[in-house]
Swiss-Prot record:
Keyword annotations from UniProtKB, A to Z: Oxidoreductase, Peroxidase, Selenocysteine
The keyword Manganese belongs to this UniProt entry's keyword annotation: no
A GO biological process held by the record: response to oxidative stress
Active site annotation, chain numbering: 43
E.C. code: 1.11.1.9
Induction: Activity increases significantly as worms mature in their host and is positively correlated to the resistance to antioxidants.
Name of the protein in its database record: Glutathione peroxidase
InterPro entries: Glutathione_peroxidase, GPX_AS, GPX_CS, Thioredoxin-like_sf
Amino acid sequence: MSSSHKSWNSIYEFTVKDINGVDVSLEKYRGHVCLIVNVACKUGATDKNYRQLQEMHTRLVGKGLRILAFPCNQFGGQEPWAEAEIKKFVTEKYGVQFDMFSKIKVNGSDADDLYKFLKSRQHGTLTNNIKWNFSKFLVDRQGQPVKRYSPTTAPYDIEGDIMELLEKK
């Protein structure tokens, strides 16, 4: 992979590790609308976000929505667990069936390249840094980040934008 984010053209160029440590090429999401979210299990927003994300997954996976969740411990140490514990928690408490990935960093020089790309394409307010857990990026069927949402924006609040992209074939 190139070290310059200017050469990245879509999310399909990235390979990430899933929650079990297995390499996953994001090419597998080609043709789908993706919602990419940095998550944490011990955040005040955990319950609302995981419940809404899972419910949306259940309803919209058949229409082409894919939710990609990336645990991150950069905000208040609210994702301290190892991947096996994270997986157990979200599966048992929320019945999570959407795709969970290994813990990453989303800010700083050692941020995951996928997040460097997302932030370069959809800038934040005041700063490009991810501000907290449950920041969201909406990616179209061509692998292009088209919208960025703040951590306080609930999944249900962006459903209209998701539906608009799902209706575009």
